[in-house]
Amino acid sequence: MARYTDSSCRICRRETMKLYLKGDRCYSDKCAVERRNYPPGQHGQGRGKFSDYGLQLREKQKIRRMYGLVEKQFKTYFKHADRQKGVTGTNFLTLLERRIDNTVYRLGFASSRAQARQLVRHSHFLVNGKKVNIPSFLLRPGDSVSVVEGSRQLQMINEAMEAMPRRGLPPWLELDKAKYEGVFKTLPTREEMNLPVQEQLVVEFYSK
């Protein structure tokens, strides 16, 4: 399945909530959801209620697009989470949060997950002192993530770091801005992740 290439703003409007796909724009009055908080298209404002299946599908699509994954990747994470001990939905979100591209975004080294993915692919980051260029690389508690020294002058990284206070730093991460380095301290709890999603609907969708 190909990666979704439609307008990021249309994706957010379809889900009628901010998915923070366009970086700083999402925090401004230019955000499409702020101006038109209804699905795009001719009948966007008049759409009726979803069936149970429709709600499950919408929630699955919302989370998948939030993290920028294709269906095959997304389902693989779910299967992995389902095999783990504990609550499947929480396990699932934790796996997504452990991705290095997501952590680069959370630390404020990128303005969006899409930008973080691009930066990781171009080898701008180190994990425990070693270059990693695979966006799906999963971090473990105690792992450090730092910007390669030669990449610390990149405008997009520095602009993202300047805008970081708008988003705030999650409690499971630690950041030393002066050193361009962060630490994945511990696995996040569901409460700490504070995501506006209903992951149980995804569990129900894949459990059929």
Curated annotation (Swiss-Prot):
CDD domains: S4 (cd00165). One of its GO terms (biological process) is translation. InterPro entries: Ribosomal_uS4, Ribosomal_uS4_bac-type, Ribosomal_uS4_CS, Ribosomal_uS4_N, S4_RNA-bd, S4_RNA-bd_sf. Residues 98-160 form the S4 RNA-binding domain. One of its GO terms (molecular function) is rRNA binding. One of its GO terms (cellular component) is small ribosomal subunit. It comes from the Bacteria. PROSITE patterns: RIBOSOMAL_S4, S4. The keyword RNA-binding applies. Keywords: Ribonucleoprotein, Ribosomal protein, RNA-binding, rRNA-binding. HAMAP family: Ribosomal_uS4_B. One of the primary rRNA binding proteins, it binds directly to 16S rRNA where it nucleates assembly of the body of the 30S subunit. With S5 and S12 plays an important role in translational accuracy. Part of the 30S ribosomal subunit. Contacts protein S5. The interaction surface between S4 and S5 is involved in control of translational fidelity. Belongs to the universal ribosomal protein uS4 family. This is Small ribosomal subunit protein uS4. It comes from Syntrophobacter fumaroxidans (strain DSM 10017 / MPOB).
